[in-house]
């Protein structure tokens, strides 16, 4: 689900370059 998608943003550094990850994942910028 959505949580898994966010978690994947956190795990991969590449994920953080995606704008969706930066907007929705706490690990990637938005705190």
Curated annotation (Swiss-Prot):
The modification Cysteine amide is found at residue 28. Residues 1-6 form a propeptide. Expressed by the venom duct. SmIIIA' is a putative isoform where the N-terminal AA is missing. One of its GO terms (molecular function) is sodium channel inhibitor activity. The keyword Secreted applies. Signal peptide: none annotated. It is found in: Secreted. Keywords: Amidation, Cleavage on pair of basic residues, Disulfide bond, Ion channel impairing toxin, Neurotoxin, Pyrrolidone carboxylic acid, Secreted, Toxin, Voltage-gated sodium channel impairing toxin. One of its GO terms (cellular component) is extracellular region. Disulfide bonds join 9-21, 10-27, 16-28. InterPro entries: Conotoxin_mu-typ. The keyword Acyltransferase does not apply. Its main location: secreted. The modification Pyrrolidone carboxylic acid is found at residue 7. It comes from the Eukaryota. Mu-conotoxins block voltage-gated sodium channels (Nav). This toxin blocks rNav1.5/SCN5A (IC(50) is 1.3 uM), rNav1.6/SCN8A (IC(50) is 160 nM), rNav1.7/SCN9A (IC(50) is 1.3 uM), rNav1.1/SCN1A (K(d) is 3.8 nM), rNav1.2/SCN2A (K(d) is 1.3 nM), rNav1.4/SCN4A (K(d) is 0.22 nM), rNav1.6/SCN8A (K(d) is 69 nM), and rNav1.7/SCN9A (K(d) is 260 nM). This toxin is very potent but weakly discriminating among sodium channels. The block of these channels is modified when beta-subunits are coexpressed with alpha subunits. Belongs to the conotoxin M superfamily. All peptide bonds in this toxin adopt the trans conformation. Negative results: does not show activity on rNav1.8/SCN10A (IC(50) is >10 uM). The cysteine framework is III (CC-C-C-CC). This is Mu-conotoxin SmIIIA. It comes from Conus stercusmuscarum.
